[in-house]
Amino acid sequence: MVAPGLVLGLVLPLILWADRSAGIGFRFASYINNDMVLQKEPAGAVIWGFGTPGATVTVTLRQGRETIMKKVTSVKAHSDTWMVVLDPMKPGGPFEVMAQQTLEKINFTLRVHDVLFGDVWLCSGQSNMQMTVLQIFNATRELSNTAAYQSVRILSVSPTQAEQELEDLVAVDLQWSKPTSENLGHGYFKYMSAVCWLFGRHLYDTLQYPIGLIASSWGGTPIEAWSSGRSLKACGVPKQGSVPYDSVTGPSKHSVLWNAMIHPLCNMTLKGVVWYQGESNINYNTDLYNCTFPALIEDWRETFHRGSQGQTERFFPFGLVQLSSDLSKKSSDDGFPQIRWHQTADFGYVPNPKMPNTFMAVAMDLCDRDSPFGSIHPRDKQTVAYRLHLGARALAYGEKNLTFEGPLPEKIELLAHKGLLNLTYYQQIQVQKKDNKIFEISCCSDRRCKWLPASMSTVSTQSLTLAIDSCRGTVVALRYAWTTWPCEYKQCPLYHPSSALPAPPFIAFITDQDPGHQSNVAK
């Protein structure tokens, strides 16, 4: 994975945001500035910063000459911080936020302008999240299409590491800004994420109110760097050992990115998170990913809920991109299919009991042989963002009768006497092309098992029959698309007919010889 150069040097504006009259040490948190989006109702947005211990801080929300509300607090002596929770606000704006510190009749004032209320989404992960609009298909057209989205505001966190949890960001690459072709296409793997931007743009098209997008990602990084020590301990992750440099090219030390790039944001009120990571774990703690990923989600949720004084939902929506593919890996390598499976906590679908209120974009059919950034970095981020936003509309916004996931079998029936395996799906299926290798059966004989292809025999709108007569022993399991590169671009065999969403990969045990799994894959 590509690891960008460390971008620092944006600390100076932390002082310049405030009026010249501001006292030394009195300031907003690093990400509270002009053009920002604050979380709308039903939650209350959090405004916080640093000040002189014992001082009183009055936060005023204004629109034009009208005062909307005032909140009064004091600076805590042990942390030099102050915080208020605004009353829930309807989407819209612009507003001005003013903070005034008073100590012994001396006042210092801070102001930020053009503040909107809407939904705030945090986007994180490694380089596929970090890729910019400049790097994707039809970049010129996408970069020219910003004028209609001035209510979608963007913020990008600088790649930074820390040994301990930080209270505030050290630096930012891009302060809250209106989108332009310059800040969306500012080089490769830096500033604003293409997936994040396109996801937010889809949300704005649907919701028609302000969207705030925060990009905090770093290429070549394993999940351990983004996880707190608490969540890693819960999964029994061993202490730092050797890391495979072919897949982990960014920071790998446990928790250093959580400490510096995520924890400082936890006081913010969020709507949700979108996550694109996993490539750096295909040969590193792969077997633990089915624990470390759900644990990360749970820990982020708990920390943001607590940090925002309960304003961020305890189980806020969490979206993920299931891994695409990589031409440099052998098709027999198990890393990619294992991580794809573990990204669902080994259920094959989300949400599930271990990952509630989550949604997923399947990307295994979006391969890109000719990507100048390597096939591990496919350029079609438009489809990724579109599939993500469908999940958000269904899970985060409660839109009914919306197809947001591809078909999974709900029943697998072994007809051994006929040499057939029958799959019944809970959705309609469309066989785009017959592939006699993408389904495989585990055939066991004399205590030895091997995977054999199972060809498609007959297909109907919600069922599929596989021929398994190649197995002379006992069929104990079935898997689908269990390879690094399952198909060419948008050419996997199975899709949902109206939504064009691909069937996700799965593995299922179809006899009681392995009682740990059932043959019902889907919900």
UniProtKB/Swiss-Prot annotation:
Glycosylation sites: N107, N138, N267, N290, N401, N422
A Gene Ontology cellular-component term: lysosome
Gene Ontology MF term list: sialate 9-O-acetylesterase activity
EC number of the protein: 3.1.1.53
A biological-process GO annotation: carbohydrate metabolic process
Catalytic activity of the protein: N-acetyl-9-O-acetylneuraminate + H2O = N-acetylneuraminate + acetate + H(+); an Ac-O-9-sialoglycoconjugate + H2O = a sialoglycoconjugate + acetate + H(+)
Pfam families (UniProt xref): SASA
Primary location group: other
Superkingdom per UniProt: Eukaryota
Keywords assigned by UniProt, alphabetized: Glycoprotein, Hydrolase, Lysosome, Serine esterase, Signal
InterPro entries per record: SASA, SGNH_hydro_sf, SIAE
UniProt-annotated location(s): Lysosome
Signal peptide start-end: 1-23
The keyword tRNA-binding is assigned to this record: no
Biological role stated in the UniProt entry: Catalyzes the removal of O-acetyl ester groups from position 9 of the free diacetylated sialate N-acetyl-9-O-acetylneuraminate (Neu5,9Ac2) in the cytosol and of the diacetylated sialate residues of sialylglycoconjugates in the lysosomes. Together with the sialate-O-acetyltransferase they regulate the balance of acetylated sialoglycoconjugates, key players in various processes such as cell-cell interactions, host-pathogen recognition, and tumor antigenicity.
PANTHER family with a match to the protein in the record: SIALATE O-ACETYLESTERASE
Protein name, entry field: Sialate O-acetylesterase
Species this protein is from: Pongo abelii
